[in-house]
Swiss-Prot record:
Job of this protein: Component of the chromosomal passenger complex (CPC), a complex that acts as a key regulator of mitosis. The CPC complex has essential functions at the centromere in ensuring correct chromosome alignment and segregation and is required for chromatin-induced microtubule stabilization and spindle assembly. Contributes to CPC function by facilitating loading of the CPC onto chromosomes.
GO biological process per UniProt: cell division; chromosome segregation
Principal cellular location given in the protein's record: nucleus
The keyword Cytoplasm is assigned to this record: yes
Record has Metal-binding as a keyword: no
Species the sequence originates in: Xenopus tropicalis (Western clawed frog)
Region of interest called Disordered, as start-end residue ranges on this chain: 135-180
Protein name: Borealin
Amino acid sequence: MAPTKKKTSRKPKNRCVKNEKLASFIKDFDSQVKIITEELKASVVNILKEVDSQYNIEIIKLPMAIREMCWLDYIAKGGSQKALEAAATVKVDMEEITSTVTKTPFKLDKKVKKGKCKSDETLEPNPLQSVIRTKTKAKVAAKKPSTARKTRASTANLTNTSKRTSKRGRATPSASKQIETSLLGYTPAATPRIDTSIFKTPALRTPCLQEPVYTFSANGSPLAGMDELFINVPAGDGKNIRLLASEVDSLDINRLDNQAFENIKLLSSQLQRFCKKLK
């Protein structure tokens, strides 16, 4: 008998290789499809933006009459050309109206007023109106005109110069009243000399060495001298905080600001140096 052929396991191996290749191809295909779809979506968005911009440009090119027109009226007039013709006619009519308005001169109503006045004069006078007029005239005549105005007007008419004919004393209301000299006191004949060195000091200055300093409160009242030891700590906003030796332990630290803390630290270091010198 002829020898039988040996069975080989090549078929399943080939199938596994084919499946792997197919799977890798499908993965590549899916990735490329995703990339292409994303590009298409982006291009669609860009095209829509371009269409909107072109649409807006075309609308801007149209005249204002068509832009303000309702779309139903636009379609009823038969589209773009007929609507343009209608808008052009409206524009021409408006230009004619404005030109006629600008050319026509303004009419004055003076003649009408004169005619009305003449007609009123021809009418019979009303007794009530005559009584009212006489009353008003009497009231006006009762007022006495001021003398100052008359004198000024007469001087202006007589002489056109700026010089005054009558010299009057420039008396203020307070000076016009008669005040006794005893109330005002004695005025010296010669003016006293003032020491100019007083005005050379600035508004704020630091006290000199061994100079007696008198303290004042925020209300402006002077504070009495104290035998107890105290320290003035400068704080923010130009304020000074007085610290007594007996009240240092019970002081609320939250009330102090950063500048006060720094000044206290600086003072403590300087006091330590001073105490070392005393020893």
